Amino acid sequence: IDGYTINTTPQTVKIEYKDQTVTVQYESTTVENTRQKADVSVVKKDSDTENPLDGGKYTLYAGNDIKNYAGQVIVTKGTALETVTTGEDGKASYSVDLPISNGYYIQETQAPYAYIRNSKDVYSFNFNVLPETQAKASFSYTFVNDRTTAKIHIYKVDKESGKAVAQGDASLEGAVYGLYARNDIVHPD
């Protein structure tokens, strides 16, 4: 059966002949096959250092309408199925049980602190029927984020004119400025 692994456990069946007037005696047995599963995970890294990042939130969505065996839509396309948050190792795994023969996609819904959310990076995959000896399909994707940065421009202007040109013999060159943090700055790495 598509979407299930083959059960390789031997089953014993007993059929005996008693005599020609007796109906064949038999015992029934049940054989269960396991439905194939998807192992889905994300990895979060800094775009420059490639160090793992914690605190990134990723949502797994249905990539198409998901139908039951009767053909009825049970989950509409674009529905959020589960959101996970990356740990200190930069990894997160989904626990939702995904139906086979459907498409899915993952998108960042919140960037880690001090990082810019990458809304354009979307990981799409199709969970299709596997060979009957394969119990699980693995899907993993690495997302990267840029740090939030700032640029500071300082201009020296004449006090009286408000222009970047000195008056008379005055000079605007050679000024020394200091930039100080109000709070301690901790590097994310």
Model regions and ranges:
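Solvent-exposed loop/turn and edge beta-strand elements of beta-rich ligand-binding domains
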Residues: 1-189
